[in-house]
Amino acid sequence: KPICDAVANHPKRRNFIATHPIAGTEFSGPSAAIKGLFKGKTNIICEVEKTTFKLQEKALELFKEMGMRIRYMDPKSHDKHIAYVSHLSHISSFMLGKTVINKEKDEQDIFDMAGSGFESTVRLAKSSPAMWTPIFKQNKKQVVKTLEEYIANLSNFKELLVNDDYEAIYSEMQNVNKIREILNGMNAKK
């Protein structure tokens, strides 16, 4: 939303198309380019009605050539949803990495004991702070909301553990396992 707001009154606003390709890695810069990165990925387009039809056609042709799926969304919805599925993932990864680095002062212990689960969970902690700090700043309101919910879920899990309520822990994890079908559905669309 802040980007759309920033260009709202620009005299050439109709020559701007607000897009957010949902694709990337933890690396940044030209050396991190990956051929085919956008193939099968979603590209969110906001406020398409404010862009000239000719530019829309050109952009859609380019996105189609890249193999992207298009999803139209208003900027507020984009910011809300992206805070859950992207921003929170990055924060979780950064903070898990911080927790382990602060606790495990011996790097060899981390190296020897960390398996693929840990590696995949902290992969995003390798992301560029120069890129992510402004993202968190721009979407602060939504990021704070998602963090509050996430922290409440972590606190609830901790409480269940403290109270030896392993049935509830099992049930929580079983309910969250539904994410598997969602992710499998995403992968099937690619």
Which ranges hold each PLM region?
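Rossmann-like NAD(P)(H) cofactor-binding subdomain of soluble oxidoreductases
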Residues: 1-31
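Short, flexible, solvent-exposed loop/turn segments with mixed acidic/basic and small polar residues
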Residues: 32-37, 134
